[in-house]
Amino acid sequence: PADIESMTVLKDASAGALYGARGANGVIMITTKQGKEGKTKVSWRSTAGWSSRSLKAYDMVDQKEFVQLTYEGLRNGYIFDNGYNWEAAGRQASADLGGVLGGEQYNPFKNYTWGTIIDPATGRVQGDATSAWNESWMDAIQRDNAFRHEHQLSVNGGTEKTKYMFSLGYLNEDGILINTGFQRYNARANINTEVNKWMKTGLNVSLSNSTQNFSDYEGSSNSNVWYSAQFMAPIYPVYIKGEDGKDVLDADGNRQLDYGDGSVQRPQYSDFNPVGGLVDDKADIKTDVAGLRTFLAFGSDSEDAGWAKGIKLTLNFGLDYRNKSQKSYMNMHHGNQAAAGGLLMKYNRRTQSYTFNQ
């Protein structure tokens, strides 16, 4: 973007006259910056910033509210569907609560069991119930402030007859999701020269290389990390917990992600962890782009142009090359490709195009 001087939109006849059928929907003409006569000038431009969600997340129920609502749903089902009275429905709902929520392994209130967490007198969660863990799935998959920085070096100058502009750029942007981001290198050379009174030529070459790391899950699939993290019940921990509610560490002293596939299956999103989906699985797109624009202009109105006076002819040639390579890896141990033994996919597309007009 720092190399762009101006943009012009061509529509209808003007676009068709230059590009024929390819310009039927209009053409956007981008003019890049060119060298200026004078001493060589070197400039450096850097920007930095942070990215975050543009909209505040919705308020979510907490652990006690979730248990309370689950209990009420069970109790009301027994009352309206099975004809139980209030007391009998409450007792049955309390008895069934652990089976619905995944057993004591997923009970964060270690001073009560699932069968006693509801006060039978009030039908509400015990007031002195204390939680052994309270982990936010959305916080676990996101960066609070994703850092972005961009740098541009440009060299500009020239003589009366030859002008030049060179630029180098670098962009690094962290994604809002952990282990995602975008990185790009770009370069440009723009040279214009007046060969003699009746001939001018120019060359504009641009190169870029970019890598995008992203989450390959989308839609409303359970393996979509945005979807599953928002819908995961707050009682379920991100990391494996012991009977005392504390983290179970591996041999190296690191916390272990809970995939819901232990001795007791997690009722919700079993064998999947949104954080693990971003750590264990990989997806990236690498793109190489090269562009070349050159022109050769003949003719002049100058008296010194000799035989070329009054003749005007301009030849324009453009060449574009793009190579896009995408790789996706989904691990064999957890997630929606575990049953298939994992998944490795590679996709490559290379395109070339050219434009010539006069």
Residue ranges and their predicted role:
Residues 1-17, 49, 137-142, 146:
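Periplasmic N-terminal accessory/gating domains of Gram-negative outer-membrane beta-barrel systems
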Residues 3-6, 23-54, 159-246, 277-328, ...:
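Transmembrane beta-barrel strand/turn architecture of Gram-negative outer membrane proteins
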Residues 4, 125-131, 162-167, 262-272, ...:
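Active-site-adjacent bridging/hinge elements
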Residues 10-12, 133-139, 171-174, 271-280, ...:
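Extracytoplasmic loops and strand-loop junctions of Gram-negative outer membrane beta-barrel proteins
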Residues 36-178, 216-219, 246-248, 252-261, ...:
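Residues embedded in well-ordered regular secondary structure
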Residues 71-73, 320, 324-325, 341-343:
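Eukaryote-specific, cytoplasm-facing alpha-helical/coiled-coil scaffolding segments in long proteins
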Residues 221, 254-257, 261-263, 333-356:
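Solvent-exposed loop segments that connect transmembrane elements
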